[in-house]
């Protein structure tokens, strides 16, 4: 693999605060997303992903403020997702400093959103976020991997492999593949799911969900991911960005 593997911390932001506990002794306020993003920038993260998990749209301006303040001091690509429903939402996030924008539920409800955003802003701006899980019991999808919404609580009946292929055709520039089964388990990424998606799409895959130890990261790249994303292992100080990059390098992967 010639391109450098990207290591991406993910910050879940609710009403302007980072959730999913954060422990950094050197931060005055570990709940402040701007401070935390700056800390990861110092740790040489390749990108930052913000996920706005606020249920109500009334906090949209709060997120725009977070992105604007982060862009003033963090000079690596920044992806912002959560609650993005229209090309106008994308426009406002790009204007305040986001480099890429993640779409999820809104694209499932209206797949034309993908092509409308890609046509207006370019494929490279659009990250399709897919919360997928293995079907249990009676199988309704061909691949056995189903797209979910509402943080994995709601089944869609949509085949995850079919959906990523369709999204690529419509103009998605990247897939953020989050395994709802592995998420939070700290038992490693869902390698089978990554392989299944890699077989069907040419665009980059960001593997998410399940990272618990440094050894979990190289297998995700081997399975076909181009980047790895994690939250709690970084927030809790279990691993640093440097730890992950050193492990990837040890396995022969190029890192920045």
From Swiss-Prot:
It comes from the Bacteria. Its EC number is 4.3.2.10. GO terms for biological process: L-histidine biosynthetic process. Gene3D superfamilies: Aldolase class I (3.20.20.70). The active site is at residues 12, 131. The keyword Amino-acid biosynthesis applies. It is found in: Cytoplasm. Keywords: Amino-acid biosynthesis, Cytoplasm, Histidine biosynthesis, Lyase. It catalyses: 5-[(5-phospho-1-deoxy-D-ribulos-1-ylimino)methylamino]-1-(5-phospho-beta-D-ribosyl)imidazole-4-carboxamide + L-glutamine = D-erythro-1-(imidazol-4-yl)glycerol 3-phosphate + 5-amino-1-(5-phospho-beta-D-ribosyl)imidazole-4-carboxamide + L-glutamate + H(+). Its main location: cytoplasm. InterPro entries: Aldolase_TIM (IPR013785), His_biosynth (IPR006062), HisF (IPR004651), IGPS_HisA/HisF (IPR050064), RibuloseP-bd_barrel (IPR011060). Pathway: Amino-acid biosynthesis; L-histidine biosynthesis; L-histidine from 5-phospho-alpha-D-ribose 1-diphosphate: step 5/9. The keyword Nuclease does not apply. IGPS catalyzes the conversion of PRFAR and glutamine to IGP, AICAR and glutamate. The HisF subunit catalyzes the cyclization activity that produces IGP and AICAR from PRFAR using the ammonia provided by the HisH subunit. Belongs to the HisA/HisF family. Heterodimer of HisH and HisF. This is Imidazole glycerol phosphate synthase subunit HisF. It comes from Bifidobacterium longum (strain NCC 2705). The lineage of its organism: Bacteria, Bacillati, Actinomycetota, Actinomycetes, Bifidobacteriales. The gene is hisF.
């Amino acid at each position: 693999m010639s391109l450098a593997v990207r290591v991406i911390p993910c910050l879940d932001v609710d009403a302007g605060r980072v959730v999913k506990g954060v422990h950094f002794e050197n931060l005055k306020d570990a709940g402040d997303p701007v401070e935390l993003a700056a800390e990861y920038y110092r740790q040489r993260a390749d990108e930052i992903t913000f996920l706005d998990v606020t249920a109500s749209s009334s906090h949209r301006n709060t997120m725009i403020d977070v992105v604007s303040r982060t862009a003033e001091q963090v000079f690596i690509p920044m992806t912002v997702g959560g609650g993005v429903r229209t090309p106008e939402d994308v426009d406002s996030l790009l204007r305040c400093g986001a480099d890429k924008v993640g779409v999820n539920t809104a694209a499932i409800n209206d797949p034309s959103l993908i092509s409308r955003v890609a046509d207006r802003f370019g494929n490279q701006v659009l990250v399709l976020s897919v919360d997928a899980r293995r079907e249990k019991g009676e199988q309704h999808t061909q691949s056995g991997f189903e797209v979910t919404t509402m943080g994995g609580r709601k089944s869609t009946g949509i085949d995850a492999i079919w959906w990523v292929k369709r999204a690529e055709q419509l103009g998605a520039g990247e897939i953020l593949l989050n395994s709802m089964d592995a998420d939070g388990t700290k038992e490693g990424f869902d390698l089978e799911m990554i392989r299944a998606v890699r077989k069907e799409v040419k665009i980059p895959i960001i593997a998410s969900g399940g990272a618990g130890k440094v050894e979990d990261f190289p297998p995700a790249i081997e399975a076909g991911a181009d980047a790895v994303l994690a939250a709690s292992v970084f927030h809790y100080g279990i691993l640093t960005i440097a730890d992950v990059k050193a492990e990837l390098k040890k396995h022969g992967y190029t890192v920045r």
